[in-house]
A protein has these predicted regions:
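Alpha-helical oligomerization segments
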Residues: 161-280
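Beta-strand-connecting loop/turn residues
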Residues: 37-40, 66, 97, 103-106, ...
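Short, surface-exposed beta-strand/loop "edge" segments at domain boundaries and coil↔beta transitions
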Residues: 42-54, 152, 206-211, 227-231
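Surface-exposed beta-loop interaction hotspot
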Residues: 76-174, 178
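N-terminal leader/presequence regions that precede the main folded/catalytic core
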Residues: 1-76, 80-83
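Short, ordered beta-strand-loop transition motifs
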Residues: 32-38, 134-137, 192-197, 214
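Short acidic, glycine-rich loop/turn motifs
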Residues: 45-47, 132-136, 203-205
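Short, surface-exposed linear segments at secondary-structure transitions and domain or protein termini
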Residues: 58-70, 92, 151-155, 216-222
Length: 280
């Protein structure tokens, strides 16, 4: 069986996670609340329309305690549907021997939540997340959000260039080739070889060639890169993080007290990148 570890999975989820969080940052969300009883994330959009979208509780980060706690441990007794994806992560961790997925608590570092969420997105196929204050010190709840309202636009050449360059500037991706391959798989783009150290992405409106340097890092993007100088360099400066959706920090991430309509039924469970790549 192919080797699988947390870093590999986090790299696999890095580009699509960066893309989806940038997309999510443009969605105006006010008066948000987490409705655990209905596995929903509720918010009001810029036009004053209220939405209830499917939410999956993944875990909590507690800087005060220095720990990450997986949602599958479910110390709060949340409904099974709300922690289903977290339990799926534990099952995959047991199946593929990924220890970070199978220990209820992990030692927290500044990078751990984003690393875990990138890996979670790779194995679940759900690629948008929301981080919410819980009202308990600096503890935050981490959720996957899954709804057509948040769907990404189709992948175009311009979008691929923007995603790759901004992701490289704003993430700590180790395996550029693996991250690009995973992004193409997740976004339905075709990836083929186009010469030594060059691959070609076939997208909705054309194709894009990507050159790798001797260390396997992305070194250039353009229409014709094989045997030619690098067309463009990923920016050296650090890209700014996408602005977080508006949310009142004082509001706790607790189930809504009032009765409310549940979100639309859950979509069919996605087959995550891990299973697709390993054929299981």
């Amino acid at each position: 069986m192919a080797e699988v570890d947390l870093v590999t999975l986090a790299d696999a989820g890095a580009f699509v996670s960066h893309e989806h969080q940038s997309h999510l940052a443009a969605v105006r969300m006010s008066d948000w609340r987490i409705d655990a009883a209905h596995s929903a994330f509720r918010f009001t959009d810029a036009e004053g329309v209220e939405h209830a979208i499917r939410a999956h509780f993944i875990g909590t980060s507690s800087p005060d305690d220095g720990t990450w706690l997986w949602g599958w441990d479910n110390i709060n007794g949340f409904p099974p549907a709300f922690v289903k994806q977290s339990e799926r992560i534990r099952a995959l961790g047991e199946r593929y021997a990924i220890p970070e997925f199978t220990h209820a608590t992990l030692v927290l570092s500044d990078e751990l939540p984003s690393t875990l969420m990138n890996a979670v997105k790779a194995v679940t196929g759900v690629t948008a997340h929301f981080s919410a204050p819980t009202g308990n010190g600096a503890t935050r709840a981490w959720l996957l959000l899954d709804d057509p309202l948040l769907a990404l636009p189709r992948p175009t050449v311009a979008r691929a260039v923007a995603v790759v360059t901004s992701a490289l500037a704003g993430t700590a991706t180790v395996d550029h080739r693996g991250a690009l391959t995973a992004w193409a798989e997740q976004r339905g783009a075709r990836l083929t070889g186009a010469g030594e150290d060059v691959v070609e992405l076939t997208l909705d409106d054309g194709s894009l060639q990507v050159r790798f340097d001797a260390a396997g890092r992305i070194a250039g993007l353009g229409k014709r890169l094989s045997g030619a100088p690098v067309a463009s360099e990923p920016p050296k400066e650090q890209a700014a993080e996408p602005a977080a959706p508006e949310r009142p920090e004082e509001q706790a991430a607790e189930p809504a007290a009032e009765a409310a309509e549940p979100p639309a039924p859950s979509p069919p469970e996605r087959r995550g990148l891990l299973q697709r790549l390993l054929g299981r």
